[in-house]
Amino acid sequence: MFSWLARMALFCLRPMRRYGRMNRDDDDDDDHDGDSSSSGDSLLWSRELERHSFGDFSIAVVQANEVIEDHSQVETGNGAVFVGVYDGHGGPEASRYISDHLFSHLMRVSRERSCISEEALRAAFSATEEGFLTLVRRTCGLKPLIAAVGSCCLVGVIWKGTLLIANVGDSRAVLGSMGSNNNRSNKIVAEQLTSDHNAALEEVRQELRSLHPDDSHIVVLKHGVWRIKGIIQVSRSIGDAYLKRPEFSLDPSFPRFHLAEELQRPVLSAEPCVYTRVLQTSDKFVIFASDGLWEQMTNQQAVEIVNKHPRPGIARRLVRRAITIAAKKREMNYDDLKKVERGVRRFFHDDITVVVIFIDNELLMVEKATVPELSIKGFSHTVGPSKFSIFLS
């Protein structure tokens, strides 16, 4: 039986709009871990399998919002690969800005320092944050609500056999490696490489309270959900200028984002948590995904799906599995949910972006593997040359 919300959504359907820039999901394979859908999802875009210097990658995006707020990219070069997942909120402006600028900042800083490092990642995040706040300053007179637009930002780089990850927000990078379980070495094990900067976690709430001891409303339980200042769940982001600088405060005509008291210090941070790992022979792949995926499945469930299925289309498979789970929560199946158009579909699941980077260990030893130097943007047919060539040449 459909829930009342599902019935309402299906009753209110308008004709589905199509996009020239989006690949229609035409997969008819009914082996999708419980997804027995018989036709494609017009809001699901993917690239099945591409090469990078150290293996393959697969990327998929599904739209739920009226205007998609997730942006993403994969940059491949001879001897390096870059992944970015940018989960926007309040609008697409911040995530789009990150997609257009962060990688260029990273290449500029890395070229100046002759290496890709944790410090280079931090500098790229800082430059991106300052650039977006400058954009907000220029445009907030005409568009005040741009001050309430922000984005989570998750990036990963593999270079010289090392994986570097930087993150603000609650997107995740999860490693799949062959570990031991009861003396068996053939079990895939999930290891979360990032921290969730989300007020749902007690340690995040404690951190905020310690940083703001004079503010009894720094975190508020609202309708069963912990929110910072009663407004937002993530504690770190790019953007969200109104929670960082008093000059961007919003007046009472925007009650959702109006703060009763002027900011004394930034409430949110754009400082990333950075992680470095020298890749081991047991490391098989990394899943980079926005929180729309992790709302529907655990880290271990995700790595097991990747491990037991063929590489081509694996990111799409993860997205479809997440949508199937979301549909079941509303007493629907995937075929029903595919009839729900963008905007209304946000009641059922978030925009979801998934990138799976496979690691072929023998290629880590190759100085410069010959692969196409490509720049691929999620949810877009546009493919161009990567700026990695500037740094790596």
Swiss-Prot record:
Pfam family of the protein (one): PP2C
Cofactor note: Binds 2 magnesium or manganese ions per subunit.
Keywords for the protein's UniProt record, in alphabetical order: Hydrolase, Magnesium, Manganese, Metal-binding, Protein phosphatase
Top EC class for this record: hydrolase
Documented EC number(s): 3.1.3.16
Residues where Mn(2+) 2 binds: 87, 291, 350
Cross-referenced Gene3D superfamilies: PPM-type phosphatase domain (3.60.40.10)
Tagged with keyword Manganese: yes
Cofactor: Mg(2+); Mn(2+)
SMART domains per the UniProt record, alphabetical: PP2Cc
Residues at which Mn(2+) 1 binds: 87-88
Free-text disruption phenotype from the record: Plants missing PP2C42/PP2C-D2, PP2C64/PP2C-D5, PP2C79/PP2C-D7, PP2C63/PP2C-D8 and PP2C68/PP2C-D9 exhibit an increased hypocotyl length, as well as an enhanced sensitivity to LiCl and media acidification.
Catalytic reaction annotation: O-phospho-L-seryl-[protein] + H2O = L-seryl-[protein] + phosphate; O-phospho-L-threonyl-[protein] + H2O = L-threonyl-[protein] + phosphate
One MF annotation (Gene Ontology) recorded for this entry: metal ion binding
Record domain PPM-type phosphatase: where: 56-359
CDD domains named among the record's database cross-references: PP2Cc (cd00143)
Keyword RNA-binding among UniProt keywords: no
Domain of life (superkingdom): Eukaryota
Family stated for the protein in its record: Belongs to the PP2C family.
Protein purpose: May dephosphorylate and repress plasma membrane H(+)-ATPases (PM H(+)-ATPases, e.g. AHA1 and AHA2), thus influencing negatively plant growth and fitness.
Protein name (database record): Probable protein phosphatase 2C 68
Source species: Arabidopsis thaliana (Mouse-ear cress)
Lineage: Eukaryota, Viridiplantae, Streptophyta, Embryophyta, Tracheophyta
Gene name of the encoded protein: PP2C68
